[in-house]
Amino acid sequence: MTCYLRKAKMDDCDLLFEWANYPMVRLNSFSTKPITYDEHVNWFRNIMERKDCVQYIYMEGDKPIGQARIQICDDMAEISYSIIPEKQSLGHGHEILSDICDEVWREFPNVTKVVGKVKPDNIASQKAFERAGYEEVCRVYEIKKNDINNPN
């Protein structure tokens, strides 16, 4: 069945809220705490009004199976994406990452690169990015103020 991206509508708010709180989505997110409904609604309204962000729903026929969001900053687009659990490990990750590039190049001609950030233990997403033609260009290291191993 053919898969494609469509722009999100306000009606997608509850669906995206459900997906955002899937345990694996929270685990692979850079912000792992659960999201409250009020937080999500406020965030979603903001995203839908912004000119530098576009939220997409990834469709398989008439069934939503994932989401992708881009945020534009000058000549760069940063992507965030997820696929519903029952459709993971079927190749949809690299497909959505390829499709989002096509959307970015068409909608934002000034953008020259698309960037995705992946946690070190999210091997499936790393492989999806690589299979879609992205290449790893750096690693980011951080230390938090109250980390036990912080020597300061």
Which residue ranges define each predicted feature?
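Charged, low-complexity, helix/coiled-coil-prone segments
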Residues: 2-4, 36-47, 69-72
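Hydrophobic alpha-helical core bundles mediating ligand binding, dimerization, or RNAP-core interactions
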Residues: 16-21, 40, 44
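Conserved GNAT-fold acetyl-CoA-binding loop/helix
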Residues: 24-42
